[in-house]
C-alpha cells in the first residue's frame, strides 16, 4: 500500500527527468557540459554520420547519449542511488575507463586492435550501467542505453575505425584526443 502514496519528491524527480530529456539537443547540452565533452560529442556525431551516412540517425544517437547522461545526473543529484548501486557505479566507472584506455591504445598502436576484447569491454560496460539505472529508468530509456552501446559495439564500425588506413582515421584521432583530455580532467 505504501507504493501508492503520493510523493511530491517523486513527481518532481520525474518532471526533472522528463523536462531535461526533452531539452536534450547538442546546443542545450553544451550549456551544461564543458568544452572537451562537447567536442567529444561533436566528434562522435561525425563518426556516426560517416559510418551510417544518415544525419538523422547520428543526431538521434547523440541525443540518446545526452538524455542518458542527463537522467543519470538528475538521479545522482537527487540521491536516488542506493549504497549498492553506488558501488556498482564504481564498477561501471572502472570498466568504462578500461574501455576508453583500450580505444586509445588500439588507435595509437597499429595492429594491436582486438575486436573480441573491445566488444566484450563495451558489453560489460553496458551491463554494468544498466545494473545501476534499471530500477530508476523506463524501458524506453533502457532501450536508449542499448542503442548507444550496440552501435558502438558493432563489429563493422570497430573494424573500420581501427584500421590503420581507416576512412575514419582523422575523426578517430580527434575522439582519442578528446577522451585523453576528458580522462585527465576527470570529466569521464
UniProtKB/Swiss-Prot annotation:
Domain of life: Eukaryota
A cellular component annotation (GO) from this entry: cytoplasm
A Gene Ontology BP annotation from the UniProt entry: positive regulation of apoptotic process
GO molecular function, one term: cysteine-type endopeptidase inhibitor activity involved in apoptotic process
Signal peptide coordinates: none
Family in the record: Belongs to the TNFAIP8 family.
Protein name per Swiss-Prot or TrEMBL: Tumor necrosis factor alpha-induced protein 8-like protein
Organism, scientific name: Drosophila pseudoobscura pseudoobscura
